Amino acid sequence: MAAASTLKNMALCLTLVCLVCSAVVGAAYVVTVDPIAAAAQAKTTASIAAVLPEFSGTPEQGSVEWNGAKYNYYKADGAGYAIISSTSGFGGVLTLMVGVAEDGTIHNTTVLSHSETPGLGAKCTTDEHFMSQFRGFDPAAKTLSVKKDGGDLDAITASTITSRAYALAVSNAVAVFHELTDGGQGDE
């Protein structure tokens, strides 16, 4: 004869199922945590190399608070700063790494993460005309905003909000660069 279904039996079964599921999730975390961290570090290293002129050695890592937000940066002697800058785009947070040369010009930019609309705002990672506008851009001589707002940058077609967010992230990185080089403070 089968045991009567009681509250005690149901609670015991549910507890066992939860323990097994928790063990599986915990094991998956232990197995994947190091490869995920290594992949993130490799992406950061590749991004630093992509946004700064060629340099030797390992960049110094630091952070600085500017305008109420924390900015992580990497300083490569003789090459400039690679600064991680985030803003809100159309679909969510847009995070860039911006390479600012020692003379204050933008060497290059790259998108670290975004949640923009595929085929529209996501073109900020593939639209070569849009991305090339930032290479060699001198914020001291030009306005770092889209033409629709009186600036010198062409927006991505049908993605003005993303283009504005991208320009703002780059502009913020330039401001952080000046904070660091003009007597500001970072935790180097």
What are the language-model segments listed below?
Residues 2-188:
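Flexible, solvent-exposed loop/hinge segments and secondary-structure transition points
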